[in-house]
């Protein structure tokens, strides 16, 4: 919530939320958004899109933690929208399609977003690219890929044991998929001051497109 405030984003500006999977670092923030929505004047509504496991977890946590007077408002104020592999839906002026990333650790969905002007953004989720999903990512204008660490530091951070990739792995995937721009995120945080330069340099050895390694609160214009 502090970071939303620092970014100048009001709770009321968030009407739609996509949650990839049920890990705590992805789900717990949604509980605060739900609570704030329920506390604000009607008729504000929050729509949350995800698969059944995530939605069931959100419902259970809210029922255990929120005051009864807020829980009673949920049916009218919180729309939990279950999506399935390959489903298409629209959010504002964006057309989205979600897909199962075929995680062996936790059910997880990525998504594609067709933006105004013909720009296509693809989010791979929280794990490495799976070749089974090549059709979703091929030729994307923007590819969002996790990169847990540098390939040079793989022995220290053990990314493959954690179902994660390196900056070099993500760059190779981006090159093979012929995307225009690569966004690297979900990194270790031991090198924050040098992260942008280090990750960009390693990725550039395998990918010749634009590479972004955003710092917290950095804004990227998708064009």
Language-model segments: residues:
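Binuclear metal-dependent hydrolase catalytic cores
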Residues: 1-123, 128, 133-135, 197-223
């Amino acid at each position: 919530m502090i970071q939303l405030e620092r970014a100048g984003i009001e709770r009321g500006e968030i009407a739609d939320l996509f949650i990839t999977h049920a890990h705590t670092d992805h789900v717990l923030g949604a509980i605060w958004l739900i609570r704030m929505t329920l506390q604000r004047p009607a008729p504000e509504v929050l729509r949350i899109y995800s698969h059944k496991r995530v939605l069931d977890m959100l419902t259970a946590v809210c029922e255990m933690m929120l005051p009864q007077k807020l829980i009673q408002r949920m049916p009218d104020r919180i729309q939990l929208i279950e999506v399935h592999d390959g489903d298409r839906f629209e959010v504002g002026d964006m057309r989205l399609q979600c897909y199962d990333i075929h995680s062996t650790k936790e059910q997880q969905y990525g998504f594609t977003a067709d933006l105004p002007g013909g720009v296509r953004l693809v989010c791979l989720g929280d794990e490495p690219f799976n070749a089974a999903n090549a059709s979703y990512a091929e030729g994307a204008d923007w590819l969002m890929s996790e990169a847990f660490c540098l390939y040079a530091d793989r022995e220290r951070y053990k990314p493959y044991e954690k179902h994660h990739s390196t900056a070099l792995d993500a760059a190779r995937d981006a090159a093979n998929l012929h995307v225009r721009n690569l966004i690297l995120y979900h990194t270790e945080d031991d090198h924050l001051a040098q992260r942008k330069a280090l990750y960009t340099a390693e990725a550039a050895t395998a990918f010749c497109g634009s590479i972004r390694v955003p710092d917290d609160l950095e804004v990227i214009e998708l064009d």
